[in-house]
Amino acid sequence: MKRHLIAAALAAASFAAFAAGGNLRYTIQVNKFENKANWTGSWDLGDAWGTILTDQLVQSGKFIVIGEADMRGAAMAEQDLAQTGRVAGGKKTPKMGRLSPAQLLVKGAITHVQETKGAGGGFGFKGITIGGDAGSAEINITIYLVDSATGQVKASKSVIGKSGKRGLTLGYHGSALGGLTGDIGGFMKDNMGKAAMDACNQALEFLVAQLDSIPWEGSVSLVKSDKLLINRGTREGVEVGMKFDVGKVEEIVDEDTGEVLDSEMTKIGTVTVTEVKEKICYTTALEGAEKGMGVHPAK
């Protein structure tokens, strides 16, 4: 409960600058950030960071966000339970083999946390108080963007989140917060909260900036005389009028290691999107197109 309240507070303040803009999207998953700074407080810093960043990625509209490992584990457990026959069957029963894979993985570590506390306000939890009206806070984060197909780090960056200015206390008291009491309404005004928000904003900006350098591709799923069906839709940011190159894609493989070095398309033509659904789109017909051919944004 505590980390979800924190995530909601931070994401609401930062996602507006990254509103969806019709970009072609990729699936992405955030893994838990290791708390190498050994900072302790009323919330788990590594868990909270993953929750905050996952929520910000969703709110940005620029990614297809896959649930964190614990959420996917819960989904797989439900699928396993359904296979035992102990739950009612039907169209809504969870089925195996349908989890969306993550193309990109976000991993990192919290390397340093520094907090100078002032008097008044803050959070209280089991005898621990965070923040206050005065003082400052700083959080150092190292973030990695990993290609899930190869395990290679595509990009990395170190960010430093700083509280910057004095905090205010809005005040919220009561037991409904699961032990987290005090000025929860002022989390974003708390020095540690402001530092975390600043670091999250920088991390999100870094991830969005990497999109132009990551190849986007799809496949032809169905060929008819008057149209093609491609396995990408509104979920991936496809819009009516977009143009895609279609052709046979060959992978260039390192004969020594088996690593895929690159891919090359033998283009047969370009199609235009005429209709879009959530996971698929329809395009103009193309002579010579075959099911399974590759699809890239038109150059």
Named regions from a protein language model:
Residues 1-8:
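Bacterial N-terminal signal peptides that target proteins for export
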Residues 9-19:
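Hydrophobic h-region of N-terminal signal peptides that target proteins for export
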Residues 19-89, 94, 99-102, 152, ...:
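A structural "domain/chain start" motif
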Residues 69, 157-159, 264, 271:
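Short hydrophobic alpha-helix segments
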Residues 79-154, 164, 173-178, 239, ...:
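Surface-exposed short loop/turn segments
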Residues 125-139, 236, 283-297:
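Short solvent-exposed strand/turn elements
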Residues 245-299:
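Beta-strand/loop-dominated core regions that host nucleotide or nucleotide-derived cofactor-binding catalytic loops
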